[in-house]
């Protein structure tokens, strides 16, 4: 599948076309152009795991609810999933928790990644401390070009191959939906109302970071969703706009 995706990217580049949406959802993600980080600086960060392997990120919303991306939950059941909290390392440390159920946003559209957000319900409550904390949701869209930070685990595009054990983070700038859909960038009408973008030359979230946090001033402003390639010029990372889906997150978290 990976070779097929790379081939599609090459064809798209040569002919100036956009790879079909969903082909490069950032679900097996990596942080590109980032640095090793400690969980104390991102205590809301979790590793979503299946079959003992990290494959998506997420954010702690409350003592028993995690926010992640809807596309991370395709073709899975809750019993297959685990969440590691409180560790800078996806493979060890902290605490590994079971998922009792999950809920995908009712307006999620798989082909376009609209409303690409979901909630996970833990089977027991977390105890908050310096490495395990909830993150507050933003009430509004952050200013254009605001400093933001993305964190997660995954391939770094530099040797050795494979995903790094330690959490990584990268600084990016907020790009509003209207500008992300403009001629300044390559997405056009693929950017929908539920999305926001972030961009920096040579820096990006990528496959495996999906569901993870985009943060401004310690507020969750975005959920890693999709993009064309990773850190590719003119193609910012695309995120769920948390201000756009906040009310439904809050109400569903109370009822899940």
Curated annotation (Swiss-Prot):
Enzyme Commission number, as recorded: 3.4.21.-
Q: What is its main location?
A: secreted
List, in alphabetical order, the Gene Ontology terms for molecular function in this entry. serine-type endopeptidase activity
**For this UniProt entry, which residues form the secretion signal?**
1-22
Please give the GO cellular component terms listed in this UniProt entry.
Answer: extracellular region
Cytoplasm recorded as keyword: no
Per the UniProt entry, the propeptide covers 23-30
Q: Which domain of life is it from?
A: Eukaryota
| UniProt keyword Lipid biosynthesis present | no
Question: What InterPro entries does this protein map onto?
Answer: Peptidase_S1, Peptidase_S1_PA, Peptidase_S1_PA_chymotrypsin, Peptidase_S1A, Trypsin_dom, TRYPSIN_HIS, TRYPSIN_SER
User: Which Gene3D superfamilies does UniProt cross-reference here?
Assistant: Trypsin-like serine proteases
The cysteines joined by S-S bonds are 56-72, 180-197, 206-230
Q: What is this protein called?
A: Hypodermin-A
């Amino acid at each position: 599948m990976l070779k097929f995706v790379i081939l599609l990217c090459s064809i798209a580049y040569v002919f100036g076309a956009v790879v079909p949406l969903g082909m490069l959802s950032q679900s097996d993600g990596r942080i590109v152009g980032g640095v090793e980080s400690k969980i104390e600086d991102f205590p809301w960060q979790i590793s979503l795991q299946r079959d003992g392997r990290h494959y998506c990120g997420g954010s702690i919303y409350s003592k028993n609810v995690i926010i992640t991306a809807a596309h991370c939950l395709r073709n899975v059941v809750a019993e297959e999933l685990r969440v590691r909290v409180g560790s800078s390392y996806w493979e060890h440390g902290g605490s590994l928790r079971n998922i009792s159920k999950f809920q995908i946003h009712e307006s999620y559209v798989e082909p376009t990644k609209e409303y690409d957000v979901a909630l996970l319900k833990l089977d027991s409550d977390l105890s908050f401390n310096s490495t395990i904390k909830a993150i507050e949701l933003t009430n509004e869209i952050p200013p254009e070009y605001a400093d933001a930070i993305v964190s997660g685990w995954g391939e770094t595009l530099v040797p050795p191959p494979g995903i790094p054990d330690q959490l990584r983070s990268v600084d990016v700038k907020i790009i509003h939906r209207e500008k992300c859909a403009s001629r300044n960038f390559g997405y056009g009408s693929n950017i929908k109302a539920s999305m926001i973008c972030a961009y920096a030359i040579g820096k990006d979230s990528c496959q495996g970071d999906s569901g993870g946090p985009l943060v401004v001033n310690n507020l969750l402003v975005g959920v890693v969703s999709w993009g064309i390639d990773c850190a590719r010029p003119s193609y910012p990372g695309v995120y769920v706009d948390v201000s756009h889906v906040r009310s439904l997150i809050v109400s569903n978290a109370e009822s899940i």
